[in-house]
């Protein structure tokens, strides 16, 4: 089998295509959640706390010196990213919970036990014959 043909079969397998679609949708969803947190949730939260913009929270570790920029730790951006993570994790949790609920509905009734094999039928007949002989004696 040629390398290209083998790669094409691999790439067109359902799981790989599903994974690619999931990654693309996940990236787009991440942008939406980031915008939701940065533009919708954090401004009112900052206003409730006292007009604070979380993006501005930072600690300067070293001031700028000449052409060397300052070393700054932006922990406000980190707080915003934590909110992003919590919202994404909650959305994924809810999606999985919904999928599990739908899968439970699709579960089939327990399958009927399989028919006895030829050996089991034969052994049952022998057992019944032996019982019959013992009852006659």
Swiss-Prot record:
InterPro entries: Mechanosensitive_channel_CS, MS_channel, MSC/AndL, MscL_channel. It holds the Pfam family MscL. PANTHER family: LARGE-CONDUCTANCE MECHANOSENSITIVE CHANNEL, MECHANOSENSITIVE CHANNEL MSCL. The chain crosses the membrane at residues 10-30, 76-96. Homopentamer. Its main location: membrane. Belongs to the MscL family. SUPFAM superfamilies: Gated mechanosensitive channel (SSF81330). Channel that opens in response to stretch forces in the membrane lipid bilayer. May participate in the regulation of osmotic pressure changes within the cell. It comes from the Bacteria. Coiled coil: none annotated. The lineage of its organism: Bacteria, Pseudomonadati, Pseudomonadota, Gammaproteobacteria, Enterobacterales. This is Large-conductance mechanosensitive channel. It is a multi-pass membrane protein. It is found in: Cell inner membrane. One of its GO terms (molecular function) is mechanosensitive monoatomic ion channel activity. The gene is mscL. Keywords: Cell inner membrane, Cell membrane, Ion channel, Ion transport, Membrane, Transmembrane, Transmembrane helix, Transport. NCBIfam families: mscL (TIGR00220), PRK00567.1-1 (NF001841), PRK00567.1-4 (NF001843). GO terms for cellular component: plasma membrane.
